[in-house]
Amino acid sequence: MENLHKRILEEGQALSNDVLKVDSFLNHQVDADLMYEMGTYFKNYFKDHNITKIFTIESSGIAPTVMTAMQMNLPMVILKKQGSKILKGDVYQTTVHSFTKGTDYELTLQKKYINEDDNILIIDDFLANGEAALGAARLVEGAGAKVAGIGIVIEKSFQPGPKLLEEKGYDVYSLARIEKLEKGIIKIKK
């Protein structure tokens, strides 16, 4: 996805060998046109996967997921990271370690938003160690549903997540694959 690659190279900041800051268009200020284009790419790739719902994890995956759900005319579910008085009782939960924040959180899904017949597309902003995507997949599979695919905006190909998801047999489609990060240097796989 050439527009995304261009934005990463022009506006992204490699803060270290494993941290890429893209807050000018993805996770602080959001470029709606770019999100719409991402939705088109995800729709085109996953259109024959018999998807029934699209899941994302709050919060940075929401914008590209909304655009994908709109274009595929499918419901979208936001998996919650924060505890809430509203999310009690009939829920699925799993513990996930956040690479970015260095902490664990409980990923939560209300049972009423999934059933055994669902084929779920999971979309997230980053794939690093694979913890978030695997946590979402655990919730889906724990409900007896199927993970139809995983859409990633930016994959850090040099970290363990991509290989881990591949070994588990998931169909992963990444819009940008970062080959290498060094302070001030970003290299994208073509």
Swiss-Prot record:
Keywords: Cytoplasm, Glycosyltransferase, Purine salvage, Transferase
Xref: CDD domains: PRTases_typeI
Stated role: Converts the preformed base xanthine, a product of nucleic acid breakdown, to xanthosine 5'-monophosphate (XMP), so it can be reused for RNA or DNA synthesis.
Predominant localisation class: cytoplasm
One BP annotation, GO: XMP salvage
Protein name: Xanthine phosphoribosyltransferase
Gene name of the encoded protein: xpt
Positions bound to xanthine: 20, 27, 156
Family designation: Belongs to the purine/pyrimidine phosphoribosyltransferase family. Xpt subfamily.
